[in-house]
C-alpha cells in the first residue's frame, strides 16, 4: 500500500524555522554564561522549550501539517514566553 504523503504548509514551516533560530540563539547565550551554576539553572529551565520545539519539529517531519500542529506551536510559544518572562537573557 502506498505511503500517505505529508500535508505541507509553508507558513507553518516559517514558524518552525523561526522557532529553531530562537532556540539556537538562546542556547548560545546560555552557553556563554561563565558561572556554571547559573548556566545549569538556565539550561534546566530552557529544557521545556527545547522539548516543545523538538515535539513540534518531529511531528511536522513525520506527519506534516495536521490537527495537532496548531496545539504544538501554541505549546512551544507558551513555553518560550514563560522562559522569557522568568529569565533575563
What does each model-found stretch correspond to?
Residues 22, 31, 48, 66, ...:
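Compositionally biased non-globular segments, especially hydrophobic aliphatic-rich helices
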Residues 4-7, 21, 40:
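Positively charged, low-complexity intrinsically disordered regions
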Residues 26, 30-37, 60-63, 87:
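Secondary-structure edge/capping motif, primarily at the C-terminal ends of alpha-helices
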Residues 66-89:
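Amphipathic alpha-helical binding modules
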Amino acid at each position: 500500500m502506498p505511503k500517505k504523503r505529508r500535508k505541507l504548509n509553508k507558513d507553518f514551516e516559517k514558524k518552525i524555522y523561526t522557532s529553531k533560530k530562537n532556540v539556537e540563539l538562546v542556547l548560545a547565550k546560555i552557553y556563554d554564561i561563565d558561572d556554571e551554576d547559573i548556566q545549569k539553572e538556565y539550561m534546566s529551565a530552557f529544557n521545556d522549550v527545547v522539548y516543545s520545539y523538538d515535539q513540534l519539529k518531529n511531528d511536522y517531519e513525520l506527519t506534516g501539517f495536521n490537527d495537532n500542529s496548531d496545539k504544538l506551536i501554541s505549546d512551544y510559544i507558551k513555553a518560550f514566553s514563560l522562559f522569557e518572562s522568568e529569565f533575563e537573557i
